[in-house]
Regions:
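Conserved glycine-rich Rossmann-like NAD(P)H-binding loop of the short-chain dehydrogenase/reductase
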Residues: 30-44
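Canonical Rossmann dinucleotide-binding motif of NAD(H)/NADP(H)-dependent dehydrogenases/reductases
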Residues: 3-33
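Substrate-binding pocket helix/loop in short-chain dehydrogenase/reductase
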Residues: 97-98, 105-107, 208, 212
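Short C-terminal tail/terminal secondary-structure segment
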Residues: 146, 232, 243-260
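Active-site helix of classical SDR
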Residues: 121, 157, 165
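Residue(s) in the substrate-gating loop at a strand-loop-helix junction
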Residues: 141
Length: 260
């Protein structure tokens, strides 16, 4: 079903969840501009979309660069005629506690994971208002609620996304712009693979993924496509009364106690 037919979308992040969301929105009928800093991932997404004849155009960008993102927004509007959907999926995941994390790493994490959301709200909301409203979806994390050790910058950034989402939702509800966040648990992405390699360098990644999955009540880790399905719903008019919320795709992880 083409529930997003006639919608124009901008998605940041071209690997993992961002890639899956760009593909899913296009499969739902949206015209999509996806942007990311990883040139290899950008090329792979462009090829995958072309193979399926999906309307996904891929742009290189640094989501922390105000003028660069202004250009991406202008490109989206000029090519497709407007902007209805923004998905903020670009993220970095540095490791370390407060002593181990230097200020440059902290600031970069906050700018990529949180500052980029502000930048696209600043640039994109005026375009959405011209269309009579829109939907913004921010990728947060269960680590914004309960975190593991050694990820101080990442966990702080994901908690900040929850608060920023609520603030944007309240400010722009009168503009008919809905703003929601999604908090995934462990999802099979390149980022999770790097995390597995960092915390368990002597184990095979597949074994670590299996162990991560066992911590979730459903007994497995999730897929990017499962997150993308929720994003497509929140982007659609079917979610017309949903704003200011955070939605878990965590296999029940936060429903239980860590003590077994």
């Amino acid at each position: 079903m083409k529930e997003l037919l006639g919608k124009q979308a901008l998605v940041t992040g071209t690997t993992g969840i961002g890639r899956a969301i760009a593909m899913r929105l296009a499969a739902g009928g949206a015209q999509v501009v996806a942007c990311g800093i990883d040139t290899i991932a950008n090329a792979e997404l462009a090829r995958a979309a072309a193979d399926l004849h999906l309307a996904v155009e891929v742009e290189a960008c640094d989501v922390t660069d105000l003028e660069g993102m202004r250009s991406v927004v202008r490109t989206t509007v000029s090519r497709f005629g407007g902007l209805d959907i923004i998905v903020n999926a670009a993220a970095i995941h540095p490791f370390g506690n407060a002593v181990e994390t230097d200020l440059e790493t902290w600031n970069r994490c906050m700018m990529v994971n949180v500052g980029s959301i502000f930048i696209l709200a600043h640039l994109g909301i005026p375009e959405m208002k011209k269309r009579g409203g829109g939907s913004i979806i921010n990728l947060a994390s269960v680590q914004g609620y309960a975190c593991q050790r050694g990820v101080v910058a990442y966990a702080a950034s994901k908690g900040a996304i929850h608060s920023l989402t609520r603030a944007l939702a309240l400010d722009h509800a009168p503009d008919n712009i809905r703003v929601n966040s999604i908090s995934p648990g462990s999802i099979a992405t390149p980022m999770l693979a790097r995390s597995a390699a960092h915390f368990s360098p002597d184990e095979d990644v597949a074994q670590v993924f299996s162990r991560f999955g066992a911590a979730h009540p459903l007994g497995r880790i999730g897929t990017p496509e499962e997150v993308a399905e929720l994003a497509a719903f929140l982007a659609s008019d079917k979610a017309g009364f949903c704003t200011g919320g955070d939605y878990l795709v965590d296999g029940g992880l936060l429903a239980g106690l860590a003590v077994q």
